[in-house]
Amino acid sequence: MQQKLKKGIFECDGHEIYSDREMHIGGINTVKVDTDLHCKMNKITLTIENTNIFRAVWRKVLDRMVWMDYEWTVKADLDSVFVPNRLLHYVQDPWIQNHAQEGNGLWLNNCWRGLHGPIEVLSRQAMQIYNNRWLQCEAVAEAKPQEDVYLQECMQTLGIWKSDMKHLLAEDHCDHHDFWKCEGNFVAYHPFKEEKKWMECRNNLGDD
């Protein structure tokens, strides 16, 4: 649906879909990641322990080197209503522009509680540092079974700049309890697992 309507990641200058198998979907071939996509739920924290899965995905992304052609790389969950033009607007901020491609680059934090996984945004320089110094995050991966916590702490370990962006994500887990109304100027809204609900949300956001 998103591909047919040219919405979500298909509004970006480039896009790829990652899966555990090669498939042809709407004219697009998925990129196969050689990993088991099954993971367990931590019964105490009630969080999904998926770091190993997303480490494999990020490694595949880095190895393909497509990210080098773009100023920003975005990992967006399928059930996120993602509006790329809004992100493009926010990253024009002079501070973000200055830090994105200098030094160790920049990543965008989407919640005051810490990074949440529905949308993750890294500058090209941050991707370069992540690629070059990948092994420095192995200890973090072993200690942090949740992929968003892993990525945040990996970025910190690598000395990559952070920018807190309050309008990056609207979701219940970050105290946006009315996210489902799809109001305001957020870049992404999450979650919308039903196709009809996803489309209603996207339509409510207008032509951004």
Model-derived features: positions:
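Conserved nucleotide-sugar donor-binding
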Residues: 50, 54-59, 83-85, 115-135
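Active-site-proximal specificity loops/subdomain of glycosyltransferases
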Residues: 16-71, 81-85
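Short, acidic, metal-binding catalytic loop of nucleotide-sugar glycosyltransferases
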Residues: 1-13
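C-terminal catalytic/acceptor-binding lobe
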Residues: 141-208
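A recurrent flexible, glycine/aromatic-enriched loop bordering the glycosyltransferase active site
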Residues: 72, 107-122, 136-145
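Conserved beta-strand elements of beta-rich interaction domains across eukaryotes
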Residues: 20-24, 35-39, 78-81, 87-89, ...
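Conserved donor-nucleotide/metal-binding helix-loop-beta segment in metal-dependent transferases, i.e.
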Residues: 65, 80-114
